[in-house]
Each structure stands twice: as C-alpha cells, then as structure tokens.
C-alpha cells in the first residue's frame, strides 16, 4: 500500500524540470498537419522531360555500318568462313542433346580402334570392328 501511494505521488506531483509526467503521457500529442510539398517544376515540364528519356540502342554488329563491313572483310581475308562457323556452332551446341546414338552420342571418337589401347568406355567400343569407321 505504501509502495502504491509512493508511485502515485511520484507520477502525479509535478517534477521541477519536466512538469507532470502522467499528464504528459496521457495528453494527446499535437502533430503539425503535413503541408503540400513545394514543387519547383510544373507537371507538364516534368512529363516532357521524362518522356524524352529513351534508352540508347545497343551497339549491334550491323553490317550496314562501314566499320563493321571493314572488320568483316578483314575476317574473310584472314580465312574466316561464316558457313563453316555456323556448322561448327550447331554441331557443338547439339553435342549433348541426343543420347540415342549407338556410340553414345556425346563422344566424338578421335581414337584409332586398332590401336593397342582402346577407348576407356567399354560401351562405346565397337566389338569386332577391324576398321576405324569414323574415318569414312
């Protein structure tokens, strides 16, 4: 009882520096009403600026550009063959796609089947083949 009375006295009596603590806790805080932000640019001007922003196009290897034509001529002069390049790319991209081939599909055999040491994978070895058919 004494403790309760002591707490009430502490909370209700005004403090010398802060005033009445209980009253301060219970009274509503008065917040300043938010004012409209001041905009320095009109909406039409802002929209005009934002609409004018366009993403720059990527630098594509456009063959109509003269420097790309020059590079391409240099590649051809150095021995670049576009058809062979496309064939090689399609071959290497499709290497792992089909697994239904008889020789495994993924491995291209560069070994000689009549050599003393054969392929490491026994399932890819053609039993009884006396000819390296990969050469044909």
From Swiss-Prot:
Range of residues in the leader sequence: 1-19
InterPro entries for this protein: Augurin (IPR028173)
GO biological process, one term: G1 to G0 transition
Keywords: Cell membrane, Cleavage on pair of basic residues, Cytoplasm, Membrane, Secreted, Signal
Intracellular or extracellular location(s): Secreted; Cytoplasm; Apical cell membrane
Record flagged with keyword Secreted: yes
Pfam (any one): Augurin
GO cellular component: apical plasma membrane; cytoplasm; extracellular space
Propeptide: 20-56, 121-136
Main location: secreted
Protein's job: Probable hormone that may attenuate cell proliferation and induce senescence in the central nervous system.
PANTHER family: AUGURIN (PTHR31613:SF2)
Family: Belongs to the augurin family.
Protein name: Augurin
Protein's gene: ecrg4
């Amino acid at each position: 009882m004494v403790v309760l009375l002591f707490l009430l006295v502490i909370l209700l009596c005004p403090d010398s520096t802060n005033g009445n603590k209980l009253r301060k806790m219970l009274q509503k805080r008065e917040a300043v009403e938010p004012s409209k932000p001041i905009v320095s640019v009109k909406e039409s001007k802002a929209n005009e600026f934002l609409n004018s922003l366009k993403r720059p196009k990527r630098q594509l290897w456009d063959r109509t550009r003269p420097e790309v034509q020059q590079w391409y001529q240099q590649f051809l002069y150095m021995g670049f063959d576009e058809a062979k390049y496309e064939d090689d790319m399609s071959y290497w991209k499709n290497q792992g796609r089909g697994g239904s081939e008889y020789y495994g599909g993924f491995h291209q055999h560069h070994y000689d089947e009549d050599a003393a040491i054969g392929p490491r994978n026994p399932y890819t070895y053609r039993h009884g083949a006396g000819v390296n058919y990969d050469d044909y």
